[in-house]
Amino acid sequence: MRATSIAPLLCLLAVATPVLAQQDQPAIKLGGKTLELATTGEQRMQAKIDGEILEEDAFIEVETSFDDGSRGAAVLLVSDGGNGCPGNYVVISVDDGKAVATDPFGTCSDNAEASADQGIITVRFPPIGGRDGTVYHWSFAKGLEPPAAEPFQPKPGTSWANANALIGKYPWEALDNADVLAAFKALLGPDYETFTNYFGKGDPMDATPEGVIVGDCFDDSAEDSTNLLIGIDPTGKRVFVAMQDGGEAPRLYPAQEQWPASLQEQLKQWPQ
């Protein structure tokens, strides 16, 4: 049963939040005013201050906020309810009695970490699956700043020696191992960035009788589905990749005749 997803980047739990039943959320004080979330008769949600609708979506949730009495701000997770873009974020602020909202921002993922510290709101999409993260900052002084990249880094102390610890992990977690990450980059060359886009829904990885760690992913959110199969050979210090778009022939790295026998058997049954 394939139940977990990294996409769209990379978004684990990507479609979980917006489809939950809408629940009452407490009002929040911002700069002497009250931010309220209300549900309409059409089962949409509105964020309102003094009756003014500042944001309306299928789903709205307050992630974090701050208030110093004279001014304050809150960051909201918002979603139109579709699977193509599980969520974005909006900052609503009150200063000198005036309430304003930013345009929605984010990466179309609802897995950001939101925090407020000393009047600065940070919305961080952490690096995952070989992809860089994205960090947004908002403040009264600067408003919403352009996003900054947070480079992906493998976990310290990881190598071929502990690659077997990847068994039971999800396919995209293979890139948390420094040696495995380097091997995929060396194998794929300019196709590495494309490769990271193929991580979608997947099960925890297992190992073949030969000890090759194997995992697969698929993404059926678009018109043309994609499939990914990866193999990791800790003994031979090699990696293997198969990528497929829709009904097209898969692209294999390296050529199939160089794949271990047990992994070639996996290819015969893939995609499922």
Locate predicted features.
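Bacterial N-terminal signal peptides that target proteins for export
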Residues: 1-8
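N-terminal signal peptide c-region/cleavage motif recognized by signal peptidases
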Residues: 16-18
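Acidic, small-residue rich beta-repeat scaffolds with periodic aromatic anchors
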Residues: 22-37, 94-193, 229-272
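Short beta-strand elements that form the blades of beta-propeller/WD-repeat-like
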Residues: 29-38, 70-86, 117-129, 212-217
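N-terminal, post-signal-peptide region of Sec/Tat-exported proteins
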Residues: 39-78, 178-198
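Structural motif
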Residues: 43-45, 80-92, 130-137, 225-227, ...
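Mid-chain, structured segments of secreted extracytoplasmic proteins
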Residues: 60-99, 217-221
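Structural signature of eukaryotic scaffold interfaces centered on beta-propeller domains
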Residues: 65-70, 114-117, 205-207, 268-271
